[in-house]
Design a protein with these regions (language model features):
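Outer-membrane beta-barrel initiation region
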Residues: 72-91, 97-99, 103-104, 152, ...
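Arg/Gly-rich low-complexity intrinsically disordered repeat tracts
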Residues: 4-33
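Transmembrane beta-strands of outer-membrane beta-barrel proteins
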Residues: 245-251, 284-288, 339-343, 401-405, ...
């Protein structure tokens, strides 16, 4: 096969494969776009119906059933983790290996615990049963006289099976591992790449807990290079219902800088006081001088950093922000947070510097675009609703974030943009309003299958046109990875901008991925000849096959050629869409994506975190 073009990319960017002449017929493009959007609403409902119809013949305790059922919800609570460890590690417990069957006619008695693998009960168990990271199946004729606790799996009682006593089922896997003596212990949470270079020490003096921290800014970019963050944090609890915190951080920017537009040192000092935790309300305030990213809903900071450090590809733009913000937030429930804030800050342009990169170090970094400099006053309200069972390894739940911001300025110094993008904005009495919404749904279909869905929308809502630092684009491996970085910027034809700035008023995109756990393990298993319970595995023990689809559009809003009316979104036949496949091992994922609405090449990319 003749290679037409190749581009080497790293984590956080993409590898371009040989160009392809394949194009999806235009008659099919609208259908593919519609399916991408329809998938967000139709598929979850159809799956729920099919699941219900398939369960007529057996009793299944479903952890996602309504609250009225005998079902536990939410993340695996700490008290349940403690109970699991206590049950399994009890010297009086009978420990069963995973994948065992209690045969018909046999009987086990006492306190019984099993780790990893399904437990089938066709005989009789007299006593309590704990199953950790496995399923429990009570076959026809099987009887359990006692309480049951299942974590990391489901429980099925076939017709003719009996379970007497309390039954508690959590589909969330227990983060535990087997130690050399056969007991279980809690596994430390896997740290993200950005947290690896972190050192901290925590100690307490009376009611005050102090944490000293030295870390990076969890990124590397063409403005700061590697930012070193350091400073103390103090926590004080004068009573059970009052929590206070003061966090002071200095920021040292290591990239050389001869520009007067950026200091080598920044800071952030934040204070919070919260009442009636975890429910109740709180008051917070922060003063800061920091480099802030534009379009921060795209790639995480650590993946941006690795791409910049390794291949001199910084897929984000930045500006200098110095100011003060005050906030008032409420927790009507453990899952819901509502916040109102007011802010006064200086926002200024910054130039790209020339930090070192491992590869392509002799090349020139992409320029950082100019922004609309000025002092801005803003007021905003934000809502976050989070029912995820885990923040680090989510398998089910909702995560919804949204906000409205109204900003004003009396001394803005605007960048001159083509009139096709925006008319000149006023330098006095300038005001705008913008909206953002990020809606995510995680579904656990079975022990091995997941379906994750996302809808993001944002942009101009009212007032004058948005400032450059609030504008949007589409394209790149975090949004629609079948397309190159900033495939849509809303720049008019013939407009040359080496910074490739995002200029769109609004953007919307949808993402869907189906994840299936593969029976693949990479690594080494240490076998204990005398006790199977002491077997240990080192390596990658979980790999997911990922099928993905994305669709989205960014545009200019208003009246006139090339614009979409304010009360409408673009028709689906104008959206860009892609399909892809990949493998995710948790700490790294490799993917292939192909645009289905344009003749783009197949793109290969690597992610260091889940897509969303």
């Amino acid at each position: 096969m003749k290679v037409l073009s190749t581009e080497y990319r790293v984590p956080g960017t993409e590898y371009r494969l040989p160009s392809s002449e394949f194009r999806v017929p235009s008659s099919a493009r609208t259908v593919l776009r519609a399916l991408s959007v329809l998938l967000l609403t139709v598929l979850p409902a159809s799956l729920a119906v099919s699941t219900a119809l398939a369960q007529d013949s057996v009793i299944v305790i479903d952890p996602d059933a309504p609250v009225s059922d005998s079902t536990e919800h939410g993340a695996l609570p700490p008290e349940i983790l403690s109970e699991l460890l206590e049950d399994y590690n009890d010297s009086l417990s009978i420990r069963l290996p995973g994948g065992i069957t209690v045969p018909r006619g046999s009987m086990l008695g006492g306190k019984i615990a099993a780790f990893r693998g399904s437990v089938h009960v066709a005989g009789t168990i007299e006593g309590s049963l704990t199953v950790i990271n496995g399923d429990l199946v009570v076959d026809s004729g099987g009887v359990i006289h006692g309480d049951v606790l299942v974590a990391g799996g489901g429980m099925t009682v076939a017709p003719g099976g009996v379970q007497e006593g309390e039954a508690r089922v959590y589909w969330d896997a227990a983060p535990v591992y087997r130690e050399a003596d056969g007991t279980l212990a809690l596994r430390e949470r896997r740290r993200s790449v950005g947290e690896l270079a972190t050192a901290q020490r925590t100690f307490a003096t009376g009611k005050v807990k102090t944490t000293l921290r030295l870390t990076t800014g969890q990124t590397y970019n063409r403005i700061e290079g590697l930012a070193i963050v350091f400073g103390p944090a103090f926590e004080y609890r004068p009573s059970h219902n009052i929590f206070t915190r003061l966090d002071a951080r200095g920021i040292l920017r290591t990239a050389g800088n001869s520009s007067p537009f950026r200091d080598d040192f920044g800071y952030s000092v934040r204070g919070d006081i919260r009442f009636n935790a975890p429910r109740g309300f709180g008051i917070g305030g922060r003063v800061y001088s920091e480099i802030r990213g534009i379009e921060e809903h795209t790639l995480p900071k650590d993946e941006i950093g690795w791409s910049a450090f390794l291949l001199q590809r910084d897929n984000r733009d930045y500006f200098d922000a110095q100011g003060i913000v005050g906030s008032l937030y409420f927790f009507p429930s453990r899952r819901l947070r509502i916040e109102a804030n007011v802010r006064h800050e200086w926002e200024g342009s910054v130039r790209a510097t020339d930090p070192w990169s491992l590869l392509r170090n002799s090349e020139i970094w992409r320029p950082n675009p100019l922004i609309d400099d000025g002092h801005y006053n803003s007021a905003g309200i934000g809502i976050e609703y989070d029912t995820r069972n885990s923040q680090n390894a989510t398998t089910r739940g909702w995560w919804i974030r949204g906000g409205v911001e109204r900003g004003t300025s009396d001394d803005v110094a605007p960048v001159t943009l083509p009139t096709a993008v925006r008319d000149p904005i006023p330098t006095h009495s300038y005001e705008y309003t913008r909206l953002t919404l990020d809606l995510r749904r995680y579904n656990r279909l079975s022990a091995d299958d997941r379906l994750n869905l996302r809808l993001w929308a944002g942009g101009w809502l009212g007032g004058d046109p948005l400032p450059v630092q609030r504008r949007l684009s589409l394209g790149g491996l975090d949004l629609v990875p079948g397309y190159e970085f900033r495939a849509e910027t809303c720049a008019p034809a013939g407009y040359a901008d080496p910074a490739d700035a995002a200029l769109c008023d609004r953007a919307i995109f949808t993402q869907a991925e189906f994840r299936h756990r593969l029976p693949i393990r990479f690594g080494y298993t240490y076998h204990d000849k005398n006790n199977r319970e002491l077997d240990r595995f080192l390596g990658i023990d979980e790999v997911y096959l990922v099928l993905l689809g994305d669709a989205g559009k960014s545009w200019l809003t208003g009246d006139g050629p090339g614009r979409v009316p304010n009360n409408r979104i673009p028709s689906l036949d104008e959206w860009k869409a892609d399909l892809g496949v990949g493998a995710d091992a948790g700490w790294v994922g490799v993917y292939l994506a192909k645009a289905v609405t344009d003749g783009e090449p197949v793109r290969f990319f690597i992610r260091l975190e889940r897509r969303f």
